[in-house]
């Protein structure tokens, strides 16, 4: 499909973004990411040995030609996130950043106040900011207004695999957004990814559902196809939902 997605200064053919955690080893991770067709993969800066060019996490992604999206996972407030972002830019040579601030280690819920504060400052510093946030239409609009290149509202809590629990709010976010909407977190099955795309999301980010699968490489293929299918359905107009039956082949004229 010739259906390109532009975020910031990059254009993507694939609308499936990926994570790098929880894979059994670097080789499986690389093969799965390649099979997924993903062109953007996120990783926590805390997992990268920035002074080691042969880093076991970094090298497979670079060798596969996939764009890096460092994230600030582990940051508990705006100050820590800004510091991590500056380190990532210096070490990895990219101004792209997935902004994550979740002070509660149990539920990993993003802190909306600290996220907005950090986003505003990071945009001023020249970062291309993609903030992970609650599926809050007001917050997403504020993040857009301070200059974020996209918003990344959650479908469900990180790693929960519950799917698109926040559907009603995602629909509002998608409707009013003037920047790309990437549904992030909670996507546990290819059908969840397809649904997000059918709703009009511009992309999805998937990690656990691929990495923790019995066969991550095959699951990556399943997600690739699901995202393509959901996007194609959205682009071509899903049939309207009705509250009563509508015959597909009415016999009225025939019987008359």
Swiss-Prot record:
GO terms for biological process: thiamine diphosphate biosynthetic process. Its main location: cytoplasm. GO terms for cellular component: cytoplasm. Keywords: Cytoplasm, Schiff base, Thiamine biosynthesis, Transferase. It comes from the Bacteria. 1-deoxy-D-xylulose 5-phosphate binds at residues 159, 185-186, 207-208. The active site is at residue 98. Pathway: Cofactor biosynthesis; thiamine diphosphate biosynthesis. It is found in: Cytoplasm. SUPFAM superfamilies: ThiG-like (SSF110399). Its EC number is 2.8.1.10. The keyword Mitochondrion does not apply. GO terms for molecular function: thiazole synthase activity. It catalyses: [ThiS sulfur-carrier protein]-C-terminal-Gly-aminoethanethioate + 2-iminoacetate + 1-deoxy-D-xylulose 5-phosphate = [ThiS sulfur-carrier protein]-C-terminal Gly-Gly + 2-[(2R,5Z)-2-carboxy-4-methylthiazol-5(2H)-ylidene]ethyl phosphate + 2 H2O + H(+). It holds the Pfam family ThiG. InterPro entries: Aldolase_TIM (IPR013785), Thiazole_synthase_ThiG (IPR033983), ThiG (IPR008867). Catalyzes the rearrangement of 1-deoxy-D-xylulose 5-phosphate (DXP) to produce the thiazole phosphate moiety of thiamine. Sulfur is provided by the thiocarboxylate moiety of the carrier protein ThiS. In vitro, sulfur can be provided by H(2)S. Homotetramer. Forms heterodimers with either ThiH or ThiS. Belongs to the ThiG family. This is Thiazole synthase.
